[in-house]
Swiss-Prot record:
It comes from Klebsiella pneumoniae (strain 342). This is Rhamnulose-1-phosphate aldolase. CDD domains: Aldolase_II. Belongs to the aldolase class II family. RhaD subfamily. It holds the Pfam family Aldolase_II. Zn(2+) binds at H141, H143, H212.
């Protein structure tokens, strides 16, 4: 008989967190991951739920998430340990009927709680639900090394970061034509950074937190992981290019436009117009 550990969403979270750890993106308890589920996903595993689910109020109501279940990583938990003890490091939560709080249905044992970045996740989920008609289901935050490094040497401007990442690897414009948003440095784990991230998610599926990390949104765990992985690969190329004296040639504006036409995507116009 299968248990909730065998469920696709638990196994998917195990793989995503393990892969992120192996990439070097999630040292210690760095990073967090949430996946929005359907009632049909969790209903077969009701026998595994806690007898008395704990209730935690949200700092602000989120009615668009009412009655929505999620699987989330825990606060203070190490990605490298998720595969060893999923129930201690992950949790299935369900937002209540008015969006004021949530019950912990499964996991997060020993009185653990969801990630401290849950406000940023839930606010971003709310915006991406509206923007994509519910298609986007994943929010991933990690400390991608080369993306962080670039925030120290490039002007922290969305159009510039977008253009440089597009130039760093040909596939980037195809994978994230909506570009990369970037915030000013802010204290993590607060409603303020959560709100700023969510507002930026209205325009971009990738949002950089300077000197800290990156947020990504997508329809599946694979798509969201791949989004960040693609941007991080380009950032790695750029870090190496900058260390070798900078670009001598690159993909031109006209070539980027041709690339967008070939793959039927609309590149962020302000990034295209930044320079020839």
């Amino acid at each position: 008989m299968q248990t909730i550990i065998d469920a696709w969403f638990v196994q998917g979270m195990i793989k995503a967190t393990s892969d992120a750890w192996l990439k070097g993106w999630d040292e210690r308890n760095g990073g967090n991951l949430t996946l929005r589920l359907d009632e049909a996903d969790i209903e077969p595993y009701a026998a595994d739920f806690h007898a008395k689910p704990r209730y935690i109020a949200l700092s602000q109501p989120m009615p668009i998430l009412a009655n929505q279940p999620f699987i989330v990583t825990g606060s203070g938990k190490f990605f490298r340990n998720v595969q060893l003890d999923p129930a201690a490091n992950l949790g299935v939560v369900k937002v209540d009927s008015d969006g004021a709080g949530y019950h912990i249905l499964w996991g997060l044992t020993e009185d653990a709680v969801p990630t401290s970045e849950l406000p940023a996740h839930f606010l971003s989920h709310s915006e991406r639900i509206k923007l994509t008609g519910g298609k986007d289901r994943v929010i991933m935050h990690c400390h991608a090394t080369n993306l962080i490094a670039l925030t120290y040497v490039l002007e922290n401007h969305s159009d510039l970061f977008t253009r440089k990442l597009w130039e760093g690897s040909t596939e980037c414009l195809v994978v994230f034509p909506d570009g990369v948003g970037i915030l000013p440095w802010m204290v993590p784990g607060t409603d303020e950074i959560g709100q700023a991230t969510a507002e930026t998610m209205q325009k971009h599926s990738l949002v950089l937190w300077p000197f800290h990390g990156v947020f990504g949104s997508g329809p599946t765990l694979d798509e969201t992981f791949g989004l960040i992985d693609t941007a991080e690969k380009s950032a790695e190329v750029l870090v190496k290019v900058l260390s070798m004296g900078g670009m001598k040639q690159t993909i031109t504006r006209e070539e980027l436009i041709a690339l967008g036409k070939r793959f039927n995507v609309q590149p962020l116009q302000s990034a295209l117009d930044l320079y020839p």
